[in-house]
Structure formats: C-alpha cells, structure tokens
Amino acid sequence: MAVRGYVLIEAEVGKAKAVGEAVRKLSHSDAKVVAVDTVTGPFDVIVQMEADDLDKLGNCITDGIQRVEGVQRTTTCLSVRLG
C-alpha cells in the first residue's frame, strides 16, 4: 500500500514562491510529488507526496525537500485511514 504524506514547509522570508517552484521540479526515484501549494498562515508551502513505503517518503523529504534553498523547517503529516 502506498504511503501519502503532507509536508508543511516554513520558508525563509520572501522565498515561498521560489521554494514552491523548486519543490515542484524535484525528481526523486523513491517518491512522487503529487501537488504543491503556496499558502498563508504558519506554513508557506504544502506538498502532497506519495511513496511505496515510509522510508522512501522520508528519503525524498530529507534528500530532496530539506535541501532546497530557502527551506527553513519541515513538518510531515502522514495520511491514515480511520475506521
């Protein structure tokens, strides 16, 4: 079963647009970027991702998203099926 996660990104001041564009262009063999949105509020960019397993999702976040220039901090929320 695929793992779906939402990566909430805090960007450096004035860098949200550039971070969103860079993340949109990321190519990683372990996971797929499904959607990237710049948003208002405590986070600047929200990324929806899918991977075959949790390790692959984590690798894409640490090797890809967290290395994008302008990314200060990430918080990852995993999608779960309840009930």
Outline where the language-model segments fall.
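A compositional/biophysical signature of low hydrophobicity enriched in polar/charged and small residues
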Residues: 1-83
